[in-house]
């Protein structure tokens, strides 16, 4: 059986690992290194260079060297070279092809199956793009796995009942995840992150600082010189790495550029303290995702058994100190190599999928809630955020109008209670509903998220069996900044949303009661005394009038009045029945009806018993 590899496709570096005798091994590349730079270059003769060789020639071939392509995954970014257009999937595929070749050379056999990792906060389009890159590279992508989850899998395989915090700061992305490990099960409890925060940003701050210092000293703007900028980037990365182990470094770049007076040289000292001041706000951006994860998981800091640092950027002393401070003084686990742990976890997951690793179950999560818009503009969640995937959830909804021929299913992603404030992923219509009173049709809406985090939605009329489906793909997933904005807004406007939801529910209850009471009066016209009928009709008329306005308190009061006077209908019916010596007749709204009305909320989701509750239109 062909072996499957685990690939950590990183922003700055990539790693490939394989199981040998059940133990994960990091594969050494053709250059003798265990990590491969995620750099692609096109030589002047048209040859495609990947990895260390591409990185080495970058200064003299700036325009034809592409790095950090992971930051463009899932976007419409393109680069034109030699009359050809390349997208991020193709660029990533060049890197994956090299990793595939190195693995084949090491193993002495063909490699086709792979598990590829992505940041936990990658959205649908970014995951799709990663999968496509693997396919372009000739790989059969068995699974897309979240990086922190893979790290925990690598770390926690032989551990019992522990809670692990994974702090993953790579070259271009940042994730925090909280996982529980026990009895061979690795379960993600919560995850959060920032897809545009990583070591590249720290490098850029040093580049900006050097450009400013050089402009002040020589009056020349190096940011306009592509070749000089490339040298600055490499020097900044080197300085950052040196400052992790020493308190001061010198950046010396002779012949960086030239002026009318002749060649100019850059010679700058940079202390660790200066570096930390330049990047203090980047460090601050790591705090919010951390706090969100602790809050979402609903645990105390004292309950965290181990802290695992992942990604080369966690080697920066300021980052390690921040993690220690955030976790209440806990020392991070030093038993894992932050550069390799994700690939090791990916190879273990590949082993699980191929049946080589037994008794391990990996339970990943979806980072945002998913639902549909229901009557009153409410967001009715079918799948809550941090739900384990793969998952399938279905609920029964109904129509809001008599003889409604179709229902619109509008799919949203986010945490706000009002649908319009969330991210709309798409919509479709279920048509051809047979004529029926409102509340009668039963429409089953099903959400299905597969193990790769890709979503499918279906709506089915249980009466006719008609079904409509939709797959959420491409650019429909959420960008990182939208996710963060939604989370912050959800907390900020929680009270306002709650009030709006209550108002919508009050209106729905009022409309439902008007409909039921009028129908009852019509069906039992000859059995209701005139005075009772007049009193009920007056109360219903008042409620209808209030429903034209926006005052939810008045609507609630009028609804309660109708519920109270409608009890007289039941009393009158039973009195008539007893007078005639007959058994009680038709059901009256009465207490039972009023109570039912309290339960009937058009936007509410329903249990597996298939009770009809919400209006889906």
Curated annotation (Swiss-Prot):
PROSITE patterns to which the protein is assigned, alphabetical: HSP70_1, HSP70_2, HSP70_3
A UniProt-annotated Pfam family: HSP70
Keywords: ATP-binding, Chaperone, Nucleotide-binding, Phosphoprotein, Stress response
Basic and acidic residues biased stretches: 489-505
Superkingdom as given in the UniProt entry: Bacteria
Phosphoprotein among keywords: yes
Induction pattern: By stress conditions e.g. heat shock.
Residue numbers bearing the Phosphothreonine modification: 173
Extent of Acidic residues compositional bias: 599-609
Region named Disordered: 489-512, 579-617
HAMAP family found in the cross-reference section: DnaK
NCBIfam families assigned: PRK00290.1, prok_dnaK
Protein name per the record: Chaperone protein DnaK
Gene label: dnaK
